């Protein structure tokens, strides 16, 4: 009798594990906007590189799923996910209340503040008084765009939206905008520490608004894909525990990008 009960328990456990595994797609299409170094961009050979790309590849390997990347502008990623043109978003996507009304997120992958980048000889600060009459570049579909349109645009500050972060920096260096407003880490590693950004700096402190900027970034998923989300969260927790996350992060950052 005990042997029969044990056999039944093993069968049930195996069936549950098999069902959970079957619920995870064998192939996943991951949407990304490759204009946001060091998280996602293209190298000289046209290959996708960056911290998000490395994280996604490792997560896919751990859940035994074949992943392909689909390039899209940031503001097209959530509509593409909901329309089932892609299965996940890995593109430095902030976990915000507004976005959580539309999609689900994995656990936090890393954190970053939002800051202005200005010329070194500029005294621009992230205040209405300092920015009034100025032109501020933002990436379409970002929390920075939302903040700018809600808090700055009504007070005489021109918010200029772009489809690629590289275009923002090009216009900043050409003098067509007065400041760029983006993720602090992306600005530091992808622009300020590069030769093209040598004449630029952060303009003032970080802009804080937890409701708009969220509590960190995560992988975006459809709300109904619970098994996939749970599998990714489990894999990510294992990466944090076994040192893989830290190893990948050190390729790009000289500080704790995960945050508190």
From Swiss-Prot:
Effect of residue 176 to D/S: Strong decrease in ATPase-inducing activity and histidine transport
Cited SUPFAM superfamilies: Periplasmic binding protein-like II
Main location group: periplasm
GO MF entries: amino acid binding
Annotated family: Belongs to the bacterial solute-binding protein 3 family.
Protein's cellular compartments: Periplasm
Source organism of this protein record: Salmonella typhimurium (strain LT2 / SGSC1412 / ATCC 700720)
GO cellular component, one term: outer membrane-bounded periplasmic space
Domain notes from UniProt: Has a bi-lobal structure; the two lobes, one bigger than the other, are connected by two short strands and are in contact with each other, enclosing the histidine. Both lobes are involved in stimulating the ATPase activity of HisP.
Protein name: Histidine-binding periplasmic protein
Leader sequence segment: 1-22
Residues annotated to bind L-histidine: 91-92, 94, 99, 143, 183
